[in-house]
């Protein structure tokens, strides 16, 4: 439908978060402090450099003194679930992970290509 969407990913699964935001940036301001990465999908489900995105989250949390290790396989599963739920041909996604390990937030919006002059 083209709407900006937000989910919380916990050990219980992917749950939609109600709200209205103008952008992923505005959405991020409503979330707890943590680390984030922004990426895009290609062909609906492919993400280039996903391992690097996830490693940056792990490293950023470590540098900030997070008291638990980020389960990358768990986070990958959440991203896969959010991509499927978004059902967009191409999407821009933001994964936000607080310093606690209880949950993550995944926001999605339709990807809009940059103009040719860029």
What are these model-predicted stretches?
Residues 1-118:
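Conserved alpha/beta cores of soluble small-molecule-handling proteins
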